[in-house]
Structure formats: structure tokens, C-alpha cells
Amino acid sequence: MLKLGVHKTFKGKRLYTEVWKDVVGFEGYYQVSNLGRVRGLDRIIEYEDGRIYYMKGGMMKTTINNKGYESLRLSKNHTRYNKTVHRLVIEAFIPNFDNKPCIDHINGIRTDNRIQNLRWVTYKENMNNEVIYYSQHYFILSVYTIVLSG
């Protein structure tokens, strides 16, 4: 089920429509938006000893992992899972018809998890992104697709 909302960005100067979808594998627990945000849903947790706990939903805080991607920890059935935000976004919004294993950040910014910045790619396509590393910053020279004729 899609839920629409309005999300203010950059000091309220621009409004975007934010679309929410359930996180694949965590339906009823978490949702992810087309803008790359993740929220937990209100739910009731029942422990094995019979205790019942009401958990209020809200926006999830993310951290930057050692590869520079936004990540977070999701819980389901008393088990915790480490997930990257870009994978949650693309799995919810873009079908992987060609079964490509990698996700490419088109503009090269690993923390930009908006749906329009993500695409499914092969390992080879992912390696074709020319990147210049300068100090601790990186810049994409070009993103291109190889077309084979013959």
C-alpha cells in the first residue's frame, strides 16, 4: 500500500511528494520512501515469557558503514539485521527483471539514496564508472553503458 506525504527539503524551499512502501521482508515492521528515508511502524511485541510491549514507530537513524553507505539495523522476531538504505529503497521501488546483482548510485554519492539516483547494474557495469579519488572526496567523470554490436 502506498502512503503519500509531503517532505520539506533544504530549509523548506522545495517540497517533494514522499511515497512510502513496506520494506521487502519486513512488511508491517518498517517502510522506506522514494527519498531514501526509513521509518519503523507502530507494533506490539510479545516476549516468550508473556510480556507485551507496545513499540511506537518513527524515523530510523542511519549510520555510515565502512564502505561509505548509509546503513541501519532492523529487527524482526527478536533477530537483528544490518541493512543498507540504498538496497531497501531499490528493492521496494524498482523491480530487478534482469537479476542484476549490484546497485549503482548514478551521481556517485553513496549517501544519496533517492530512487532517481539508483539503478540495478552488473558487476561489469558498476566497474565502468570512472572515478577520480582526490583526498577523501571522489568525483564521477562519467557513467556510461557499453553497447556491443555484432
Regions of interest found by a model, annotated:
Residues 2-103, 108-150:
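Conserved recognition-core residues within compact binding domains
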